[in-house]
Amino acid sequence: TIFLQQQQQQQQQQQ
């Protein structure tokens, strides 16, 4: 779950 959470955070930063 932590791995997916990290990916979501990265996507938000890119946007």
Swiss-Prot record:
Would you say which domain of life the source belongs to? Eukaryota
Question: What else is on record for this protein?
Answer: On the 2D-gel the determined pI of this unknown protein is: 7.0-7.5, its MW is: 118.9 kDa.
Q: What is this protein called?
A: Unknown endosperm protein W
